[in-house]
Amino acid sequence: RMDYSRFVEHHRSTGADLTVAALPVDAAQAEAFGLMRTDEEGNIKEFREKPKGDSLKAMAVDTSRFGLSVESSKERPYLASMGIYVFSRKTLFDLLDANPGHKDFGKEVIPEALSRGDTLKSYVFDDYWEDIGTIGAFYEANLALTQQPTPPFSFYDEAFPIYTRPRFLPPSKFVD
């Protein structure tokens, strides 16, 4: 689970105009995402929405510099946008005021920020995250949460509670 306070702190400490949460992925997954090519400091130098072929290969980066093992970085050499962003207020307002027709971050807003010369940073997150943008993906992600004894994500973490509507009884937990 992502600690958004760390994400925001990273954005502030780097002085970025825009920070994009990134997930290391393999080539098969990469074609379904917006990908970013970064330098050693995590500055986003290029952003492409769902590249294929040679365009995809050009987006590979050394993900070991973001804390992945050498083996894992070879398996997952692409940084996929998670669709989670932190903007400086001025940057967001300037981008939207100058381009009121822009509606898609990956296809329009982020490339525009790059072309303007704004400072874009990546925030690499290497923990549980699922893209649930389709009904099938949503179904599979929910089904995976039933895996026992250890699902890929646990809702029972005292350090990071998930708040829902007020209840006076804890939720059910089934353990085999």
For each predicted feature, which ranges?
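Conserved core of the sugar-phosphate nucleotidyltransferase
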Residues: M2-V86
